[in-house]
Amino acid sequence: MSNSYMPIDYVLNFSTFTLHAWNGLSLFLIISGTWFISGMCTKAKGDRLLLCWWALTGLIHIIQEGYFVFTPDLFKDKSPNFIAELWIEYNKGDSRYVSRHTSVLAIEGMAAVVMGPLSLLVVYAIVKAKSYSYILQFGVSIAQLYGACLYFLTAFLEGDNFASSPYYYYAYYVGQSSIWIIVPSLIAINFWRKMNGICQLHDKKKAKVC
């Protein structure tokens, strides 16, 4: 796979292992911290898992993706910070980022500005047992699915030739991005089943009254 946008001569300040280790540690702390705090709220296991997901995805959208969107000179900085180097590393799997391709810029922009805050609103809604938490989860999950599908589809329509090697293509582009198809799909399906059950129960009660 050719990679016309990849700055091949760029040297990272952090090694790939160090980047993944620190990034993995930060994600682990978010998940474990959310799990621990949610346990103090006497939430069911399913709700606690959802809280972990929504806290994690919300912070990723706002911090990591927001940094990419609002830092136009990210790939020109000669002394990039940790988040910038994460994007430089991820660019090995999808070089559209270094060129600030309009498709990824639009998708990441919506994720940072809209889906990130809404994901954190879901956290609040679950903790406070708000009635709108389910419909909000469904809506944000569908939006994430839509964004992920656009992300893959736009790459496919342009030749799907943006990775520096097959390894980075499957590990970064496919592997990491697929999370926003798998998890939102599971949440949306679960909500759909619950809504069907509620509607069926309502129809049965209505039939008895008639």
Swiss-Prot record:
Domain EXPERA: residue ranges: 46-188
UniProt organism field: Ailanthus altissima
Keywords tagged on the record: Isomerase, Lipid biosynthesis, Lipid metabolism, Membrane, Steroid biosynthesis, Steroid metabolism, Sterol biosynthesis, Sterol metabolism, Transmembrane, Transmembrane helix
Gene Ontology molecular function: C-8 sterol isomerase activity; cholestenol delta-isomerase activity; steroid Delta-isomerase activity
Annotated TM spans: 17-37, 50-70, 107-127, 135-155, 172-192
Alphabetical GO biological process terms: sterol biosynthetic process
Functional pathway: Secondary metabolite biosynthesis; terpenoid biosynthesis
Keyword Protein transport: no
Compartment(s): Membrane
Domain of life: Eukaryota
Pfam families: EBP
Catalytic activity of the protein: 7,8-epoxymelianol = isomeliandiol
GO CC annotations on file: endoplasmic reticulum; membrane
Its biological purpose: Isomerase involved in the biosynthesis of limonoids and quassinoids triterpene natural products such as ailanthone, chaparrinone, glaucarubinone and amarolide, allelopathic degraded triterpene lactones inhibiting the growth of other plants, and possessing antimalarial, antifeedant, insecticidal, anti-inflammatory and anticancer activities. Catalyzes the conversion of 7,8-epoxymelianol to isomeliandiol via skeletal rearrangements.
UniProt key word Nucleus: no
Protein name as it appears in the record: Isomeliandiol synthase ISM1
Membrane topology, from the record: Multi-pass membrane protein
Similarity field: Belongs to the EBP family.
EC number per UniProt: 5.3.3.-
InterPro entries with a match to the protein in the record: EBP, EXPERA
